[in-house]
Design a protein with these regions (language model features):
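Active-site-proximal, Lys/Arg-enriched surface segment
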Residues: 1-41, 48-50
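Short, conserved catalytic/metal-binding motifs centered on acidic residues
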Residues: 1-5, 35, 70, 88-95, ...
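Structural motif
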Residues: 23-27, 180-184, 234-246
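A general structural motif
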Residues: 30-32, 42-44, 83-85, 107
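An internal, acidic/charged active-site-proximal segment
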Residues: 56-172
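A short, flexible helix-boundary coil/loop motif
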Residues: 137-154, 225-239, 244, 249-307
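Active-site rim beta-loop-alpha module in soluble metabolic enzymes
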Residues: 187-188, 193-199, 223
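Short amphipathic alpha-helical "interface-anchor" segments enriched in bulky aromatics
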Residues: 200-235
Length: 307
């Protein structure tokens, strides 16, 4: 969320950059950990939030702070949705014994982006065994190829982890712009840690599900930051008001995604995006809420005082 080199309130986190140099400076910022639900390729909605607050006023240690926030968030989700089958997609930060333990206790599954530095032992076992397992498979594409490999049942302190490797090689041809007609080689490679059983028939599907994390990042947070929602703007100096605005942003983005997913229906009306959103806004004004009817119906007066 919002960050600045200036001062924020006591709830904010901070980091010292370029320590011990002339360019040393302090960055203060607000941080939130968000659980998003993938309902549809075009609909990714927020369904639980955990604001990370600096209770002891120490410099933030990303790994420690974010993991602790994740444990609190998982407890919230389990309490609110005790019977909901859940598969968590996340980055390599969560590849640790504490995460595996909580998933086992809650009966949840996981597909995590994995990097060698997360748990080096798992990477070492994978490299030692993958050539012996014979699970490598390759598929030829029109513009290149992609391949999969995996090793099942790597024992890490009693937790059985399956590691999946995905790689691709493609030739990209520029069709527009200054580089039109030029060819560029593109190589990608990712590892995923999961507790789902892995086989030749489902390995591609598991990789696709694991890559949902990027969809959440790109179509969720990046959309809110860069496409009109201005999530990183400080809308208020009051911490609670800022949190309220964040929640409203999540609701607004959810409504917008549902609208855009109904593209075929809206195309018949031939209206711009702004016009469609305005129509939805007007429809909200006509809805009578069942909750707190007495408070809504009570006459009030708002007086503004100029200083």
């Amino acid at each position: 969320m919002y960050s600045t080199r200036g001062e924020l309130d006591g709830k904010s986190l901070y980091r010292i950059h370029q320590k011990g140099t002339e360019g040393e400076y302090r960055e203060s910022y607000y941080y939130v950990l968000e659980a998003k639900l993938v309902l549809h390729p075009k609909i990714i909605v927020s369904f639980q939030t955990e604001f990370v607050e600096n209770e002891d006023r120490k410099e933030m240690e990303k790994q420690d702070c974010e993991r602790k926030a994740c444990w609190r968030l998982m407890e919230k989700i389990a309490e609110a949705f005790p019977r909901l089958p859940i598969c968590l997609c996340g980055d390599s930060l969560y590849a640790c014994e504490g995460f595996f333990e909580r998933c086992r206790e809650m009966g949840w599954r996981y597909i995590l982006r994995y990097k060698e530095g997360s748990i080096p032992y798992i990477a070492g076992e994978y490299r030692a065994l993958k050539g012996k397992e014979g699970n490598y498979q390759e598929r030829v594409l029109e513009d290149g190829k992609e391949w999969y490999d995996y090793v099942e049942d790597i024992d890490y302190n009693g937790y059985h982890v399956n590691l999946v490797e995905y790689g691709s090689y493609r030739k990209r041809v520029y069709k527009k712009g200054k580089r039109k007609g030029e060819t560029e080689e593109e190589r990608k490679g990712f590892w995923f840690a999961t507790d789902f059983p892995v086989g030749r028939k489902n390995v591609a599907n598991l990789v696709q599900r694991g890559r949902m994390r990027w969809k959440i990042e790109n179509e969720g947070f990046n959309t809110q930051k860069k496409q009109g929602y201005h999530l990183e703007h400080q809308y208020s100096k009051d911490y609670q008001a800022m949190k309220n605005h964040y929640y409203l942003t999540q609701i607004g983005h959810m409504v917008a995604q549902v609208m855009e997913a109904w593209e075929k229906l809206w195309s018949q009306n031939r209206q711009s995006r702004e016009q469609r959103h305005q129509r939805v806004l007007e429809s909200f004004k006509k809805v009578r809420l069942k909750e707190n009817r007495e408070e809504i119906g009570r006459r009030i007066q708002i007086r503004l005082e100029l200083e």
